[in-house]
Amino acid sequence: MNPVFTHNIWGGTKLRDVFGYKIEGDDIGECWGIAAHPNGTCTIANGTYQGEKLSDLWEQHRELFGDTKGKVFPLLIKIIDAKADLSIQVHPNDDYAAEHENGSLGKMECWYILDCEPDSKLVIGHNAKTHEELEDMVNHGRWSDLIREIPVKKGDFIQIDPGTVHAIKGGITILETQQNSDITYRVYDYDRLSNGKPRQLHIKQSLDVITVPAAPLSDCMIASGESKVNELQKLIECKYYKVFHEKVVSEAAFNQKFPFLIVSVVEGSGTLNGTAVKKGDHFILPYQFGEVKLQGNLELVASTIAE
């Protein structure tokens, strides 16, 4: 796939310097590695459908995706480079988004920590016990009382359900698997200016959708640490997606038995069924692809729809 990139006030240069993407600027926040969204759609990099938009392929060749139902391609895959803190934010569920955001999908997402600085933390959840306490904390700017920060390290995996207050802190790079939605409600943005003006906040919507009380951390921290070698391991299966991780040393194989399988190479290089792949590559293995033979030293994060 040919990715889509975004420039953000919190972005940096790792997407170019570390992942090798040819994109200018020192504020590159996101690589949309697999995307078929009105705000950005990838094009096919090579092969039979070279140059076509993923969104068009989804509409015209649904057989490649196991005849999966749905008006829009269901998932969106990003690499996010947070040089600075992202806003404290929350996403709506499908019902709220459909009613208030012109029929959009809601946004469930999950994060695989690709890299982070020592002693890094994420904002996951909040400390309000009741909705009244939440409103008081938000309306009076009691952010240190409100937000819940957790330490994280490379290799951690975190699930972010709709309604979860969250933020990626500076110095963290993640691979994000999410519903195909671009709806974000900002709760707090550190009073930063963008083009000389504060960025828009969405206090009413945020208070509408934030889950109170917050889910326990055990519901969010799904997996942590090193994985087994040469084995496609499931990290999570939820309502919208399944996510897998594999660390390949020398060679490995598995059967692509899903309607389709999205693959992101997040470390190293090698070959997949004889085709060269490297860090930063994103691709889709279509329905009935069959056996996947991997050679080299590389790390993959893969995903598909829940069945």
Predicted regions and their residues:
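A short secondary-structure junction signal
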Residues: 100-101, 122-125, 136, 169-172, ...
